[in-house]
Amino acid sequence: MKLKEVNLVQKGAFQESFLEADKQSLLLYYQNKGYIDAAVTDVVRETTYNAQKMRDELTITYVIKEGAQYLFDGMTIEGNVIFPTEQLQSLIKLKKGAIFNQTRFQESLAAIADLYYENGYTSNGFYPETNKNTETRLVSCVLHISEKPRSHIERILVTGNTKTKDYVILREIPLEPGDIFSKKKVETGLRSLYNLGFFSAVIPNIQNGSEENLVNLVVDVEERSTTAIEFGVTFSGVTDPSAWPVSLFANWKDSNFLGTGKTIGVNVTGSNDEQVLSFNFSDPWFLNKPLNFSAGFNIKHKALTALYYNYVPGGVNKSNYYMNYDQLSFGLEAALGKRWVWNFAAFTLTGGVANDFARNFYDNKLYVPVDTTVSDKYGKFGVQNSIWVKGALNARDVLFDPSKGWFASQQFKWTGLLPKLESEYFLRSDTKGEIYFTLLDKPMSETWNLKFVLAAYTGFSFLFPAQGSPIGKLNKLYIDGMFNGRGWASAGDQSSSLVGHAMWSSFAELRMPIAPGVFSLDFFTDVIAVKETPKKMFTELSGNDFFFSFGPGLRFSLPQFPLRLMWAWSFKMRDGAFEWNTSTKNTGKFVLSFNLTNQ
């Protein structure tokens, strides 16, 4: 019902146009219960004055004549040659002998028409002949089908775009002039266009062509900004009172550079312990093929700590004393991938290479690092090369703010390509999976739905070192507190010094879009565990290894502003006993993160 009683969230204002719509909703409700002769015979309006609230209040009474309840007596199909009767009958959602349901009856007719439509038969005629037997109270139908030849695409036109080039839009639609029309291919193209993030609306329109059995596909788009300029300040707790607890960042990114669909971005980050300058570029249609090429360059300076050998009476202590050192690094990376787009999902196979050159600075007269990967880069630039390959299946309805669907990926990365010139040789495996369900989608007004989406993720990461090769601390797996184990990783908490070769990270989120496609309120819960080796992840994992967190958050789903603002309470179980995060106790912690999309 569009007319709502006044309450905390409804104004209760009367609109005459809604009255007729509500009458039709009432009739449909009865028709779905088998009362096909139901009628609204009168609408009685009574106005009273509420002296306490000083307003007129209207009471509306619908007078309904229900009539008799009917059962469905089946559907006979005539005129079909292209598809067998058994196949068409299987699309009928009403079973013979069931209570007649008008909505399911119409859905059955639409499903039969869609089968033809999806296979290019857009000019067919469908003429249902409904028969009502008032004595037996049965409803039957004879569907007459007038089959015509397949329709072909004459032209594909684009309207509404002012920045984006026509070819950027047309290449996402898997149809060309002369092709047989396919509804599924049109839907696949629309999904691809939405996932570009360039448009707030994509509306298809099928028009008759210049001749019979020719159609024109018109795609009308509404562009949105693809350029993002961000400046930010984040605050974090530090244990050093002389440290500057502020991190500054600035980003510039255009994901549709000059309307060509290419992405160019620059990022600058500055904090007390890290400064980064990075550039990146990507082209999703490299060489005008469905190939994604990306490249990046970065310069970093980090202030780090590492264990060092401390000679004490009676031996050497190598587990309690930390040294400070600085690292200057340069990084280059490039990747090339190919994608295959199907009706149910898109598959991407990508390979890449990365080169990092790093040099460490510290007083070698005072310190000898325990980690040999630190000392190997002292006084000279050490090199670290890696190659990787990744396969990903994406069946999410919308890439940046999904309501349904799933995603799965597997990546293998080998680090260490030059014998004797590099200090680390290991394989890293990353397995990821996501799934989304819409739990509720109820219209509350003409422009807003109350919607809840359940999102779930799990991921496994493993490191396998080559025989005799160490893995430095910077490459080991850990809880970062921003993307996994949100709310943890504060200085001095139970997770801050935990690193390993195996990590299992999962989360579940209940999302309520406030402005769909812009931002939503979320409630999240994270679970994460880190173990020394992959084998121990499967043989020695216990409840003591898990770190938990939960809390509310505000998530921005615009590609140009992918921020997440969260308040996280974190805890763990130790020998079955509840234990708060030792750094935040039960007060919680503010977490600034980014809404990154797995691809």
What would you call each of these model-derived segments?
Residues M1-T239, S247, N251, G265-W285, ...:
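Periplasmic polypeptide-binding modules associated with outer-membrane biogenesis and secretion
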Residues G12, D179-F400, W406-F407, F452, ...:
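Gram-negative/organellar outer-membrane beta-barrel architecture
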Residues E78, G160-T162, N310-V316, K365-T373, ...:
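Flexible, surface-exposed loop regions and adjacent strand-edge segments
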Residues V527-S549:
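Outer-membrane beta-barrel transmembrane domain signature
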